[in-house]
Amino acid sequence: MAIEGVLNEGFVTTTADKLINWTRTGSLWPMTFGLACCAVEMMHAGAARYDMDRFGVIFRPSPRQSDVMIVAGTLCNKMAPALRKVYDQMAEPRWVISMGSCANGGGYYHYSYSVVRGCDRIVPVDIYVPGCPPTAEALIYGVIQLQNKIKRTNTIARKG
């Protein structure tokens, strides 16, 4: 069988997909977008007790250096354009984790006139972490779920 036959079956690209996705799962760099009390739990998850560095998660201060955004807390209408702007500054591929009831759907302030009822109305969300506020363990579980999602994606476009 010639190399053309191997390429047509997708063997080379699927192997490259697995390799690329494996390296991405071990080097997630989230950009912290802490808006309320959930940000304290996010900081707790990055501290010494839970140490998210062991999963390859290193918090970055700049959106240009990160590929994951963790939206933690209540998103107000005035902050929504800033959230979108920061999301647009992130390099592809990028993922979003919505952390807490307020970021997921408005939470306690759902019926307030100034609160966005879920950050998924502003940016596409990949993983939802429930809780008010969610524990550090829940955030770590969400990161592990994001790693599993990344492993299942196709990164190299194939011609149909």
Swiss-Prot record:
Keywords: 4Fe-4S, Cell inner membrane, Cell membrane, Iron, Iron-sulfur, Membrane, Metal-binding, NAD, Quinone, Translocase, Transport, Ubiquinone. It holds the Pfam family Oxidored_q6. Signal peptide: none annotated. Its EC number is 7.1.1.-. It is an enzyme of class 7 (translocase). It is found in: Cell inner membrane. [4Fe-4S] cluster binds at residues 37-38, 102, 132. GO terms for cellular component: plasma membrane; respiratory chain complex I. Its cofactor is [4Fe-4S] cluster. Its main location: membrane. Binds 1 [4Fe-4S] cluster. NDH-1 is composed of 14 different subunits. Subunits NuoB, C, D, E, F, and G constitute the peripheral sector of the complex. NCBIfam families: nuoB_fam (TIGR01957), PRK06411.1 (NF005012). Belongs to the complex I 20 kDa subunit family. NDH-1 shuttles electrons from NADH, via FMN and iron-sulfur (Fe-S) centers, to quinones in the respiratory chain. Couples the redox reaction to proton translocation (for every two electrons transferred, four hydrogen ions are translocated across the cytoplasmic membrane), and thus conserves the redox energy in a proton gradient. PANTHER family: NADH DEHYDROGENASE (PTHR11995), NADH DEHYDROGENASE [UBIQUINONE] IRON-SULFUR PROTEIN 7, MITOCHONDRIAL (PTHR11995:SF14). This is NADH-quinone oxidoreductase subunit B.
